[in-house]
UniProtKB/Swiss-Prot annotation:
The reaction(s) this protein catalyses: adenosine + phosphate = alpha-D-ribose 1-phosphate + adenine; S-methyl-5'-thioadenosine + phosphate = 5-(methylsulfanyl)-alpha-D-ribose 1-phosphate + adenine; inosine + phosphate = alpha-D-ribose 1-phosphate + hypoxanthine; adenosine + H2O + H(+) = inosine + NH4(+)
Enzyme Commission number(s) from the entry: 2.4.2.1, 3.5.4.4, 2.4.2.28
Pfam families: Cu-oxidase_4
Keyword Zinc: yes
Cofactor annotation: Cu(2+); Zn(2+)
Protein name: Purine nucleoside phosphorylase BT_4389
Gene Ontology molecular-function annotations: adenosine deaminase activity; copper ion binding; oxidoreductase activity, acting on diphenols and related substances as donors, oxygen as acceptor; protein homodimerization activity; S-methyl-5-thioadenosine phosphorylase activity
Organism: Bacteroides thetaiotaomicron (strain ATCC 29148 / DSM 2079 / JCM 5827 / CCUG 10774 / NCTC 10582 / VPI-5482 / E50)
InterPro entries (alphabetical): Cu_polyphenol_OxRdtase, Cu_polyphenol_OxRdtase_sf, Cytotoxic_necrot_fac-like_cat
Keywords from the named record: Copper, Hydrolase, Metal-binding, Oxidoreductase, Transferase, Zinc
Activity across pH: Optimum pH is 4.5-6.0. Maintains 80% activity at pH 4.0-7.5.
Amino acid sequence: MISITKDKRMLGYESLSSYSNISHFVTTRQGGCSEGNYASFNCTPYSGDEAEKVRRNQTLLMEGMSQIPEELVIPVQTHETNYLLIGDAYLSASSQQRQEMLHGVDALITREPGYCLCISTADCVPVLVYDKKHGAIAAIHAGWRGTVAYIVRDTLLRMEKEFGTSGEDVVACIGPSISLASFEVGEEVYEAFQKNGFDMPRISIRKEETGKHHIDLWEANRMQILAFGVPSGQVELARICTYIHHDEFFSARRLGIKSGRILSGIMIHK
């Protein structure tokens, strides 16, 4: 990944950085004002952090973007597969109605300029998508529950339906999240992936010393992207494990649920 800001509070992807008509970012733990398990650059308001500190961090975030957004669209995620189209219905809604629309949403899609689609993670997989032909974008939260339920595949299919998106026009980025080496799971999680048709030898291992399964969420989501027809060269992986690099990125497995979140965002310029 590349640094967007000098203090490295915001990183970016090389593939997306080559397009001048969009902005994107992935936040780190550096350069903010939050404290404790939220230290220091937590921009997510639904994590238990002090509201004023989140607002100050969001101001710093927007100052680091190449264009100030009309809105940071940040859903209240629930590990489901619900998506929201940021279109006429959302744009005509009141602030309160928008908050209600964003509750229980784990994927956002739009072609509207100026609205920064954001996803909050702390070990789960953030996926950013850009359809360079139709000028459409998506931000997807793929925890293990979303991954096993094919949220990335389904979001791409919704983009196909809404915008005409096809695989050859997509650039997709898989962000900092828990790695195969760190993601130990129980039998019930392994069986859920197996039941839903995943290639288990490709996305999992069993550690001899513990007898425990480990799942590769990066590969499980990359396979969904490739299955949509996206060329492998247009899929970028950060390959950064949040559990290992918890000093740089938030990790719920390390810090607990009451902790900060990585914010990944993408926006079409006005």
